From Swiss-Prot:
Function according to Swiss-Prot or TrEMBL: Nucleoside triphosphate pyrophosphatase that hydrolyzes dTTP and UTP. May have a dual role in cell division arrest and in preventing the incorporation of modified nucleotides into cellular nucleic acids.
Protein name per UniProt: dTTP/UTP pyrophosphatase
EC number: 3.6.1.9
GO molecular function: dTTP diphosphatase activity; UTP diphosphatase activity
Gene3D superfamilies noted in UniProt: 3.90.950.10
Main location: cytoplasm
Obligatory cofactor(s): a divalent metal cation
Family: Belongs to the Maf family. YhdE subfamily.
Pfam family, one: Maf
Amino acid sequence: MTERSLNNLILASSSKRRIALLKQINIEPGLILPADIDEAPLKKELPKDYSIRMAKSKAEKIQSLNPNYFVLGVDTVVACGRRILLKAENVEQAEKCIRLLSGRRHRVYTSVCLLTPDQSKQHIRTVVTIVKFKRLSEQEIKYYLASEEWKNRAGGCNIQGLAGVFVLFLRGSYSSVIGLPLHETYCLLSNYFNFNLY
């Protein structure tokens, strides 16, 4: 298979966390273009299905405007049972999410979709990670909400920040919880691109 330059790759996301994770494994996409799509879940849509649909929709939206590029779409979803916890739009929503997750296990689904030029091939991988938070005190909830670290985070969770001390255990991929499963992403991209880890 012909190996290509990373200049031919578009990341369909403006997430600083995902950009940093890609740089961690020496991947710098040629372009970074966020996709403007409708992110509302469908009625009775399961978290995994939603994550896959969002990653695919982001990649397809960007590739429709850039058909000659490879496009990487990614989506991370926090779920408590079958309930999808979206990004909190205000502190009240963030508080509901944090109280729901307090003392409970939840799942983080991150889907990665790689489209080859003209959508000739489509590769999708989904990683599921189980996380359990300690039971939070009222003071901990208050401090976390005041920090505003919940902003622009799936389920209002930022385990790279203050919420990291809430984690009793994590089973799965830490990088996936942050926003990009590095192992799966590396395996997908290494089939097409020439880059070195070292």
